[in-house]
Amino acid sequence: NINTFYLYHFKLIWQINDCWPVASWSTTDYYHKWKAAHYVMRDCFKEVIVASKWEGDTLAIYAVSDRLEEIQGELIIEVLDFQGNSVSLVEKEVNVAANTSTVLWKLNRESLLGGGSEKEMMLVVCLRQGDRVLDEKNAYFVYHKNLNLPEPHFSIQAGEENGEKFIQVSSDKLACNVMFYIPGESIFFSDNYIDIIPGRSYKIKVDTDLSPTQIQERIGVRYVR
């Protein structure tokens, strides 16, 4: 919990895997495939994370750090529409306290929206230290069920580099919680169940015995619509 970090000195995940092939609340299935929750938990356990929380009409931006020294960095908050156009961009030099949760900034909802519809906008919150991105999170003004999500069109190119296979993914419009899969194959993607923001390209490693050509021909996507 970003507000009560000092109360929690360890985390227990229940449960990680299954001993039989059924639908369940485990974060990996019987065949060791990662479910969405497992990707999320991996990212939540990074050494430094940013998180956002709506407090009425105010957006509070937090950083949670496990480091034992203070971090000096830059907080970048960008509001985008679902076509990838920048609505507003704010930047601020910040200090992240050691081994605790820190409120970095608070912003008003209306100032972020700039007159746009909250059902058609998203926030990208990024914490940088020099040229290194410590963490980046996406946030929304309303629940996903209330978003006016567009119909995206994907570009997916499979390739191989230094013996590692990958896919390069982009979209013309926002695609939420995109799941990559290949039917009938035991395959691992380094990232999955992610938001694809228009104007960006995502390189995702693919652990499989399939060739890039086979990946290209057989890969499928699902997303929230």
Where are these regions (language model features)?
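Carbohydrate-binding surfaces of carbohydrate-active enzymes
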Residues: N1-S170, A175-D191, I196-I204
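Short, surface-exposed ligand- or partner-binding patches at beta-edge/loop junctions that are enriched
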Residues: G116-R128, D209-R225
